[in-house]
Structures are given as structure tokens and as C-alpha cells.
């Protein structure tokens, strides 16, 4: 049986940092207020010259080096982003051109904060079907470009950055047990007004700003993520104690805590980077994975659980054996 095996991870963060104290000079807030409600201390934001495709390219370079893979070996690139540089061409083709991945198909997807897991599921399916062998998945976002910096309910939440994974197709006998074990993707378009931007190319001609019904989204996030995780574990004949590490979308530490409490999962098994990165949408999971691997926390053979929820609303969960 053919499996999608994780081989490398990379990340990129813009140099500019905005702390909660910096924000207190812009809107009516304090470091204590933001941290207590979200777990966020600071966020990285793009400056002139930092584009989503450039950040994606830099993260991809590190991931390819980590995997020991050359650019010409890559045959699939998917970029998950809700903040592309242009309507067209896609960020993925820009990355392909910058890296010299001349043998790779390339396209973008947009499932907002769930985008990286949607991309992971597509890559897994294509590798298993024999349509790709070495794939690059990138989540890259410039959320600061769609934030109203006068709205304290949203501007404190988001940051910019990029993260990337490399996957290889391998036979089960080559690396027994390793690879993407299972994925569950979900959506509920009736809740599209819970989190959205008030603009778009065909509607207003402008990107617009993020609008959010925070309390409603919070409640749905806790219920939907915990339910999806339970369903995935049950279908995989696993219990929560089987999980070595949980890497959730880094949206709000209170959501994460409520989810793990519902599941009975130890906080010691949760990888958090929200304090340093804030909510980087589709980039948050690979950014957290990169930091955990660099710190030596995540090891070969570990079972890692991913979970994310975002605008749409969309949500997804995935199990990966390293």
C-alpha cells in the first residue's frame, strides 16, 4: 500500500514584530487584556517587499533542505492561502518558478484557516493515486493586509508568515506505519456570515477587512473540532492516549484548552506557538510543527494530530505518523 510520508518542514516569518504593547498605542487595549483572552503576546507582519509568494518560497526552501529533496524532484506544489499576491497567477506557480520546480504541477486552494489540512488531504489522495510522488504543501498568509487596524476585536488576533511540509510517496514496506493515517474534512456554508471579509474581486473590487462574530465562532470551534477529532480517532480505532502530540490551528488558546478538556488530552501534549505568531491562518500548523521539530520535541515514530477551523466555515482533522 502506498502512503504519504512526511519528510521535511520549513517556515518563514517577516522581520517586523508588533507586540500587544504596540497595539495599545493604536487601539483601546492592553497586553494583559489580549493575552488573557487569546494567549497572544506578539505577531509578525509583512513590510514592503514581503509577499505571500516570497514567504512561501522561503519556507519551501527550508522544507526541501530538511527533506533532502531537490527542486526538480518535486512534482506537486499546493499553496493554501486566503491572501494571495494576485488574483492570477497563483502563488503556487510563482513558488514553482522561483524554486525551479520545473516538473511540478502547481495550484492554490482557499479554505481559510483550514486550508493547510485541506491541502494535506489533497496531496495524500494524489500520492496514493499515483498522481504525485514528491509534494510540497505550503500555507502562507499576509493577514495584516485584510485586518482593520482600528478594530480591536480583530486586529489583535492575526499575524503573517508561511510554513511548508514535504511529503514523499512510499510503499508501506519501506517505512512501516509512517505517513498520513487518515483525514476528515468538513464544511458548513450556512455559517458563512460568522467569519468573512467584507470585500472581494467580483463584489467590491477590494479585498475588504475581516469581520467576525467572535462568540458564535468560538462556540462552533469548540464543538466541531472536538467532535471531528473524536470521530477520526474512532474511525482509526485509536483512543486519545495514542496521541503523542496535538498541533491545533493557533487561533485562540481558550478554544484549544476547551477542546483538549473535552477530549481528555493532556496539555503537555499540545504544541503552542500562538503567543509568538498569533493567528496566521493556513500557516499556523506548519509554523508550529517547525518550531516543535526545531526544539527537538517531535520525534520519528510520533503520532501527531492536526486540527483546524476557519471561514466558510470549514474545518478538518488529520493523523500523521512520523
Curated annotation (Swiss-Prot):
Gene Ontology annotations for the cellular component aspect, listed alphabetically: cytoplasm
Swiss-Prot/TrEMBL domain comment: The last Arg residue of the ACP-binding site is essential for the weak association between ACP/AcpP and FabH.
GO BP: any one term: fatty acid biosynthetic process
Organism this protein belongs to: Anaplasma marginale (strain St. Maries)
Subunit structure: Homodimer.
Known EC number: 2.3.1.180
Pathway membership: Lipid metabolism; fatty acid biosynthesis
UniProt name for this protein: Beta-ketoacyl-[acyl-carrier-protein] synthase III
Sequence similarity: Belongs to the thiolase-like superfamily. FabH family.
Amino acid at each position: 500500500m502506498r502512503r504519504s510520508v512526511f519528510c521535511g518542514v520549513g517556515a518563514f516569518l517577516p522581520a517586523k514584530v508588533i507586540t500587544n504593547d504596540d497595539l495599545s498605542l493604536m487601539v483601546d487595549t492592553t497586553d494583559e487584556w489580549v493575552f488573557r483572552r487569546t494567549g497572544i503576546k506578539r505577531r509578525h507582519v509583512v513590510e514592503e517587499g514581503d509577499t505571500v509568494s516570497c514567504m512561501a518560497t522561503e519556507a519551501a526552501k527550508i522544507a526541501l533542505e530538511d527533506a533532502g529533496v531537490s527542486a526538480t524532484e518535486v512534482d506537486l506544489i499546493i499553496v493554501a492561502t486566503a491572501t494571495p499576491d494576485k488574483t492570477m497567477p497563483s502563488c503556487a506557480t510563482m513558488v514553482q518558478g522561483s524554486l525551479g520546480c520545473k516538473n511540478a504541477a502547481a495550484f492554490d486552494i482557499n479554505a481559510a484557516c483550514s486550508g493547510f489540512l485541506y491541502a494535506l488531504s489533497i496531496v495524500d489522495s494524489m500520492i496514493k493515486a499515483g498522481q504525485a510522488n514528491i509534494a510540497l504543501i505550503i500555507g502562507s498568509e499576509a493577514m495584516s493586509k485584510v485586518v482593520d487596524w482600528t478594530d480591536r476585536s480583530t486586529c489583535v488576533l492575526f499575524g503573517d508568515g508561511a510554513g511548508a511540509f514535504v511529503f514523499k510517496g512510499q510503499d508501506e514496506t519501506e517505512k512501516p506505519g509512517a505517513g498520513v493515517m487518515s483525514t476528515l474534512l468538513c464544511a458548513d456554508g450556512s455559517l458563512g456570515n460568522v467569519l468573512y471579509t467584507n470585500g472581494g474581486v467580483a463584489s467590491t473590487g477590494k479585498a475588504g477587512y475581516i469581520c467576525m462574530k467572535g462568540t458564535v465562532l468560538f462556540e462552533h470551534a469548540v464543538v466541531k473540532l472536538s467532535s471531528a477529532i473524536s470521530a477520526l480517532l474512532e474511525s482509526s480505532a485509536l483512543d486519545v492516549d495514542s496521541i503523542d502530540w496535538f498541533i491545533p490551528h493557533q487561533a485562540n488558546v481558550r478554544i484549544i484548552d476547551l477542546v483538549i478538556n473535552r477530549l481528555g488530552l493532556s496539555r503537555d501534549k499540545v504544541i503552542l506557538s500562538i503567543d509568538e505568531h498569533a493567528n496566521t491562518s493556513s500557516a499556523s500548523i506548519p509554523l508550529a510543527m517547525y518550531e516543535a521539530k526545531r526544539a527537538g520535541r517531535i520525534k520519528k515514530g510520533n503520532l501527531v494530530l492536526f486540527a483546524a477551523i476557519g471561514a466558510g466555515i470549514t474545518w478538518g482533522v488529520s493523523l500523521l505518523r512520523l
